[in-house]
Amino acid sequence: MAHKKAGGSTRNGRDSEAKRLGVKRFGGEAVLAGSIIVRQRGTKFHAGTNVGCGRDHTLFALADGKVKFEVKGPNNRKFISIEAE
């Protein structure tokens, strides 16, 4: 015979999987065309020269070269460009 009252149920125990967002290639790093530079939600970084923007706002290299981060415009937007070699 059990001498322990039944435990109540919990409403915890769920958490979403991490999405591995962030900068994948940093300033000055050499990249090949097609390399992912940044995975992001929304446009924290904008695509500059030789950089493409995917459906999920992923920035990727369109040409081989070096990654360059720059702040431009009246709103101080962050742009990522590739300086072709």
Swiss-Prot record:
InterPro entries: Ribosomal_bL27, Ribosomal_bL27_CS. GO terms for molecular function: structural constituent of ribosome. The keyword Ribosomal protein applies. Gene3D superfamilies: 2.40.50.100. One of its GO terms (biological process) is translation. It holds the Pfam family Ribosomal_L27. One of its GO terms (cellular component) is cytosolic large ribosomal subunit. Residues 1-20 are annotated as: Disordered. Keywords: Ribonucleoprotein, Ribosomal protein. Belongs to the bacterial ribosomal protein bL27 family. HAMAP family: Ribosomal_bL27. This is Large ribosomal subunit protein bL27. It comes from Proteus mirabilis (strain HI4320). The gene is rpmA.
